[in-house]
């Protein structure tokens, strides 16, 4: 037995190598690995089907076609193992060697490898400093290259055309050597001395005068250094012999009818061999040079096609006009080797079927059709049948199963017990798309799915299909049960809130049973206990929704029972609650939000098991009561508000009024459009509000005959209010008015649809609607693809972010505060710090007590402490500041959101982050707003009202008081706060330039009082002092045009771009003496006007401080105000520069304007100390700062969006991270999607991994080199230890695609995009892939280094501990004995 065991080769253990290296093969290497030369283009003999000798399928080279049998049949069977047959030369071994043995072709002339030639930048060209064009001319025999100038003083590797060559030959009497084709290039490469060249290039780089020259030299130096360090020789880029792929990897398959299907590679190899043999013959015959040249060129082309068909010239096509698939195409793209076979494989032991709902299942179960189970569990059944003695052989077991005998079903029941299966629904967008269940055998052919897990799978029962997978090994079963069981995945990894929450019918049922009905049967009764309520309900003495009082015990604490106002329905619901959950959690109308909260509270207080039981009970009770409620809708439930016609008529009047203003020339066309749209948006809102108020209120008669308004039981209202189905938006279209629609381009059509679906639309209105609706469908299709691509890029960039250590010991962190927008707190500080780890001790601002110790996780109770202490800023540890070399430390990451405790070692947090951001991507729109095409544009905000009462405080506001006594704001970054008695800021608003403030400092105001107002459609330019208006450089026809409106016939003065660059249109304010008025010591009353400004004053008019002298109209509002939705998220993660980005100042200082240069405006920022900085701003862009303003570093000097690279350069990494996190969150928040900040931070961390070298110091680094931060730090440490000068680098922000391609692992990068380019570069550098990320390991077929695949779990041994028996136990045993 032992002998047999050792006789066969062992499969190689996947752990026997720890890294993989790629480099360029030398001709010796190729020959050494080869098992023989392929000399003939023949494949197999068409009569005998045996491989031809020396051909592409030769058995002598590649091994026998049948196991242990030589070609001629002299030696057969195992006993001759290892003998080489003397007749046919074939070794007697298993035929599988035909998958691994390489051959080779010796070429008659060297040939350039197309990857090193054409993959940009061309490596051969770079090394020799020849342009690609010239290089191609030489290689394809159209030009000569100097291989040895001898003493003619010619430059090395100079390229000559035919004529120039002949001339030079005459001139120097053939004193130099030149040649053409790959052989000449090879000679050049061989004669290069890389060490000398590297020195030379370093010197050149230091002496380089222009930036371009330096960059070019740096590029060459990089290639030279790569060759030096890797030990590859440059001449290996030119091939002397070509390896031939093992034949089984390019098979020839006989089809019926005597034809063959073959791999394209065989055709390509055949071409190479044919041309090579012809060339050899021509050379033997000493044919004319022209013919040989032509043949050499054809050989070069054939080899090019074999390696990368279509890279140069036209792709070689097969007989069916389809381009042949070359070796490169085998690797590239979605159907290439990497993505098709290595990263995604098809799996055995799996099946798929349609899903149906299984409402009677428990949460951990799924219904598996018997037919499927029988097929999936076959080997287990055979084993069990044999064990039980029903059968003796596998064959008879097979027969038994095929006959489906009754014993088989009993055995199946047994086998299935405790054996979880995995269910998966495509597309698997996040890890909850695959979950494990215990199978329950069912009749029929459809899989039954538990209704509560539908949200996670995003499944519905309109014909969706799901796949079943069976974990086979014990280890995989354990992992499946512990990690993937649906009962262990109650919380969502994206935001840590429950994802197993009742939906639809269940919500409606629970909502119905917890509603209150006024004056129902049994109203006002008092019950002594929970049971008494039950009895009364069953006896029909009290209505489910009556308002009653019940005496209830608090089960969590032993307090006295108390009388509680509640309803019988809520008491029934209480019966299923765990004791730990207080009754107050459900003593209210339970909407979907409240139910989610209930599951969350239950999970925190009662633990996982109780939550699962509660979820199942909620499901049953929900379905039960939604059946009892029997809610249905009819057309009469859509109540159209009475005031609708009045509102619409009023709006039409207003629109007419606006039209008149336009005709009279008071407003521009853009303003008219904006105002019209605003009027309709407001009216739609108004009608919707009235309609929703109508729906939600009923009028009933009380027992004493009075009319009382009570919450309504209108079915449509109940559905929307409970969150079961439908939204206010949809109801508004049913019973209000459809409102404004958008064109596909995103503009809003200014005639709204005044009808609703109940009244029905007119033909025109229907036509306008179809526009938006169809766009919605087209968008959805595009969106899915785009969202999937975004997820793929995110996963790729973040796949190696793994929790690698418990604590990195950093002293750095982020300061987090509440998120406010327009004075409103949109996200409280508590939500942002929950589950994070505190960096320093967090102290109570009043008492100074330690609320949270440093390095302590902030959980729910601590969050409450922090919020009640009123802290506004908290310092936390963050992924962004984590100092771990590889991966991230647990303390910086904080809580694992899906489990509710500190994250475990080995958790693949990068992939989770990518999934959490990508999965809701399909919910984001391609453009910002659309609901069935209706444009939902909020009416522009024009004023501010106080939300709370308190006293007013101005922060950094400069203002002048105008003649009405209002304060007019004169600067941009002012803020106004409302402070309560204790001095805490309750709300804070940014105040726009030109706004009217209607309150004074310290004034006490009430809630709802107006604070400020402004015009949202124009940007005013105001005067700060009183005086007389004078125009400067405002010349009609040059820098200003009187634009006459065709409709109104009225004219406006508009500043236009003048051809004369020196003209700077401005308005000056003169004092009584006729001099330019001074505002203060340094600033004059001079206002420069940007292009497009409308001048609103006449020359010589008298103005007061705070008056508007010109207006800049804002753009017409489109629906896609900003790049919304998905494209915006992609834009942020790709770190693209926005189209019109704002110039920002790099220093703090005072603004002054310099003279215009090259048609650009010059803004000078002068700091208190140091040199002033100048910024050029294109003419016609509006400069948002004024002379004399104080600006801070990072502030924009003009209108436009921020450029993330600028933020990084000026304000640093933390500010950039904050900007990216906030911007991404804003897009998701608009769609109502919750994502935890730490996921976005994880991705941003991966984008900031690299630095760019600015100054090399004494290091071996190259200038402008981009490398991982830790490599740079290591190199600097090494130099500092020797007392050298360290290098200086700046942080680099890479987009996610760029970052994925520049990872350390070439396998991961190659499988992502630009496969050939990545592999070319890696092979030249002789890169070593340490297999540290997930992707590389999946591709190499190893366990991934995350979770249970971590190295530290690999070689564990389990040792059973001896139980220690205490003396008392021994005594008991004696007594019992």
Curated annotation (Swiss-Prot):
A Gene Ontology biological process in which this protein takes part is:
DNA-templated transcription
Obligatory cofactor(s): Mg(2+); Zn(2+)
In this chain, Mg(2+) is annotated as bound at 460, 462, 464
Q: Which reaction(s) does its UniProt entry say it catalyses?
A: RNA(n) + a ribonucleoside 5'-triphosphate = RNA(n+1) + diphosphate
The source's domain of life comes to Bacteria
Which residues are noted in the entry as Zn(2+) 2-binding?
A: 808, 882, 889, 892
The UniProt keywords, alphabetically, are:
DNA-directed RNA polymerase, Magnesium, Metal-binding, Nucleotidyltransferase, Transcription, Transferase, Zinc
Q: Which residues bind Zn(2+) 1?
A: 70, 72, 85, 88
UniProt GO MF annotations: DNA binding; DNA-directed RNA polymerase activity; magnesium ion binding; zinc ion binding
Q: Which InterPro entries match?
A: DNA-dir_RpoC_beta_prime, DNA-dir_RpoC_beta_prime_bact, RNA_pol_asu, RNA_pol_N, RNA_pol_Rpb1_1, RNA_pol_Rpb1_3, RNA_pol_Rpb1_3_sf, RNA_pol_Rpb1_4
> Any one cellular component term from GO for this entry?
DNA-directed RNA polymerase complex
- Listed EC numbers: 2.7.7.6
Entry-linked Pfam families: RNA_pol_Rpb1_1 (PF04997), RNA_pol_Rpb1_2 (PF00623), RNA_pol_Rpb1_3 (PF04983), RNA_pol_Rpb1_4 (PF05000), RNA_pol_Rpb1_5 (PF04998)
Free-text comment on the cofactor: Binds 1 Mg(2+) ion per subunit.
Indicate the family of this protein: Belongs to the RNA polymerase beta' chain family.
- Function as written in the Swiss-Prot or TrEMBL entry: DNA-dependent RNA polymerase catalyzes the transcription of DNA into RNA using the four ribonucleoside triphosphates as substrates.
Q: How does it assemble?
A: The RNAP catalytic core consists of 2 alpha, 1 beta, 1 beta' and 1 omega subunit. When a sigma factor is associated with the core the holoenzyme is formed, which can initiate transcription.
This chain's protein is named DNA-directed RNA polymerase subunit beta'
Organism lineage string: Bacteria, Pseudomonadati, Thermodesulfobacteriota, Desulfuromonadia, Geobacterales
Encoding gene (name): rpoC
